[in-house]
Amino acid sequence: NGRRRQRQMCIRDRYKRQHNFTAPSSYYSAKIVATITGHGFNQDRANCAEFCDHEHHYYLNGYHTYEWHPIVSDNQGCEKEVDRGVVANQYGSWPFGRAGWCAGQDVKQWVYDITDWVDNNTTNNLIYRGLYNGQEYVPEDTNGGSRKIEANVWLVWYNQN
């Protein structure tokens, strides 16, 4: 589409919750681009990861936005997505809504324009928080199931429209 982009940062390390950056000398726009999915099964107290509505919050210079997965609470959430690439008729829990993905479907990236949030004259501090019920979620592996939330977050600079 003619746009060139440069990746500035990636929050993939499970402990990296903030990123300090300065804006490039010339850019057209800046966006947060995130690919976030929940995986795992079995129950701990929250049964969170694959089947819970975790939220992902971003803060920068007094601004705030968040991403969430509303179909997770719908028992037919993924079944309703068959026309958009979900692989139907698998055994098990394929029809249930999930956190950020459905079986066979490409994971949709979440994109949010933060161009107006960036201060071009100083160091900026982008803060990320992954929450469940308003708090950081720490799974307890009591019954196996390897619950986890995969979060890949980038700050992307666009050089042209």
Language-model features: locations:
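Single conserved hydrophobic/aromatic residue that forms the stacking wall/gate
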Residues: 1-11
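Surface-exposed coil/turn segments at beta-strand junctions on protein surfaces, enriched
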Residues: 2, 25, 117-121
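Short beta-strands within extracellular/lumenal beta-sheet-rich domains
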Residues: 12-22, 109-112
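Residue-level recognition of alpha-helix boundary/capping or hinge positions
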Residues: 15-16, 33, 123-124, 160-161
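Extracellular structured ligand-interaction cores
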Residues: 18, 29, 53-55
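Extended extracellular/luminal ectodomain segments enriched in beta-structured repeat modules
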Residues: 23-33
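Beta-strand-rich ligand-recognition modules
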Residues: 38, 48-160
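Beta-strand acidic-aromatic groove motif in beta-rich domains, primarily in extracellular
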Residues: 43-45
